[in-house]
């Protein structure tokens, strides 16, 4: 996969593909045969600060932690991006989707893993 600009994080993309975040850039998507499909910023007009961790949920939506903007954003298959979490995040680096539907966020600012269910942080 060539043409990347400062690749930082790689994660599963929709339909068996890959998603790659670029430092202070965009998030590029690749198909299951590793062919370039485009970028989330290009498709949605979303401007990233510093995209970091990436995951895909069971519906095939891509979720991105943005370290600089201190938020986690969901990119649905259709429609505009949706900010899932912004309050209480200091430096979100990693994200993961748990099988039970929870969203896990690694926050490097306070050295914690935050667990969200239905967009509310669980204790």
Swiss-Prot record:
Name under which the protein is recorded: NHL-repeat-containing protein 4
Key words, A-Z: Repeat
NHL repeats, residue ranges: 35-78, 79-119
UniProt xrefs under InterPro entries: 6-blade_b-propeller_TolB-like, NHL_repeat
UniProt lineage: Eukaryota, Metazoa, Chordata, Craniata, Vertebrata
Organism of derivation: Homo sapiens (Human)
PROSITE patterns: NHL (PS51125)
Repeat among keywords: yes
Alphabetical list of Gene3D superfamilies matching this protein: TolB, C-terminal domain
Highest taxon of source: Eukaryota
SUPFAM superfamilies associated with the record: NHL repeat (SSF101898)
Signal peptide: none
Keyword Repeat listed: yes
């Amino acid at each position: 996969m060539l043409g990347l600009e400062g690749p930082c994080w790689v994660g599963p993309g929709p339909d068996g593909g890959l998603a790659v975040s670029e430092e202070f850039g965009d998030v590029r998507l690749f198909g299951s045969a590793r062919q370039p499909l485009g970028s989330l910023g290009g498709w949605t007009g979303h401007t990233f600060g510093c995209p970091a961790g990436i995951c895909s949920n069971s519906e095939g939506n891509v979720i991105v932690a943005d370290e600089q903007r201190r938020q986690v954003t969901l990119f649905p298959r259709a429609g505009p991006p949706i900010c899932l979490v912004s309050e209480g995040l200091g430096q979100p680096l990693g994200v993961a989707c748990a099988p039970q539907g929870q969203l896990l966020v690694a926050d490097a600012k306070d050295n914690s893993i935050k667990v969200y269910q239905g967009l509310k942080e669980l204790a």
